[in-house]
């Protein structure tokens, strides 16, 4: 593979990752919203003195699940951004 072909392959992969990053960012926003909603339900149940109920227990389980999903979405977005940074570093070798 020639240097020009390699550079073009890097450029194409960067473009693909940039599009993936946009979707991952939207997914993060959705997951953060789900986590916030789950926490608001917990607050509402606690304000109604629903302590020790199955309903509150389920709400905490839902929050834990939403929190985990949010963390995974954040990690995925971070991984994409890191890959883009590495591609930018490689591409800079060809422009210097």
Q: Whereabouts are the PLM-identified features?
A:
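Short, charge/polar-rich alpha-helical segments
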Residues: 1-33, 69
């Amino acid at each position: 593979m020639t240097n020009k072909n390699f550079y073009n392959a890097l450029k194409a992969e960067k473009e693909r990752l940039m599009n993936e990053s946009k979707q991952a960012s939207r997914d993060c926003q959705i997951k953060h919203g789900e986590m916030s909603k789950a926490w608001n339900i917990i607050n509402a149940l606690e304000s109604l003195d629903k302590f020790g109920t199955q309903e509150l227990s389920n709400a905490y389980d839902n929050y834990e699940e939403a929190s985990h999903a949010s963390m995974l979405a954040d990690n995925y977005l971070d991984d994409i951004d890191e890959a883009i940074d590495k591609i930018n570093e490689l591409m800079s070798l060809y422009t210097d």
